[in-house]
Amino acid sequence: MDKVKVAVIGPGNIGSDLMYKILRSRHLEMALMTGIIESEGIKRARKLGIKTSIEGVKAVLAEDDIKIVFDATGAKPHLQHAPLLKEAGKIAIDLTPAAVGPYVVPCVNLDQVKAEPNLNMVTCGGQATVPIVYAINRVAGARYAEIVACIASKSAGPGTRQNIDEFTQTTAKALEVVGGAKKGKAIIILNPAEPPIMMHNTIYVEVEKPDIEAIRASVEAMVKEIQSYVPGYRLVVPPILDGNKVTAAVEVEGAGDFLPKYSGNLDIITSAAVAVAEKLAQELQVKEGVA
């Protein structure tokens, strides 16, 4: 079975971690890593024998056989890349908060949006918390959802820091659009503690039907689904009910592919993005009669 060729734009922390995950994939071929300067990430890819370029999106557009493109740059660059990739007939998996296309959280709504040419991976906080809000909403009705994502300062590179406002806005909106909450709010905290902390997310949901047994069963089932592509995802505080307010907390340990294990915040979004790409690649293989 021929693998589906993919490219990564943006050879930073997220792009490099994506590269290692793609190299392990049974369905994806890492065909190109591209950036705009001769960075460490570009050198790293070249050492692994991967084709590289410092011509950014232009290099991707020149490669007709690349079908799926991961954009790990930033919100503003992706707004420029998106129409170019669409015009070239390439599927864009957007790991920035640009949100040109619909939000996708693999365990919640991939089947509904997989035909779209541009899929947005929300944010790391969104991938960690939207499924829990969705799980609570489907059995109890979520009037309001608020999440606090606490990540190690060391795991936040320049791209993450430049996109803090977009992070909070995009995550809050995804709590509503994908999670099902009537109103959502997101807060991010960069914790400079040494040794660095694991990504920790606290989720507060005001519910219409406070049935704790149904809520716990729904959340536990969802956690198992997430663990199928993010093995380091853990429910550290099972849902607690106080009146009509549910509190839960999850922790994410990274796989340690490229980033340290405390960078679970980055690992969850790269793992989710690769899970999406693998599903799309399998469908492309069937469609093109390659499988």
UniProtKB/Swiss-Prot annotation:
Its EC number is 1.2.1.10. It catalyses: acetaldehyde + NAD(+) + CoA = acetyl-CoA + NADH + H(+). One of its GO terms (molecular function) is acetaldehyde dehydrogenase (acetylating) activity. Keywords: Aromatic hydrocarbons catabolism, NAD, Oxidoreductase. It holds the Pfam family AcetDehyd-dimer. Belongs to the acetaldehyde dehydrogenase family. This is Acetaldehyde dehydrogenase. It comes from Moorella thermoacetica (strain ATCC 39073 / JCM 9320).
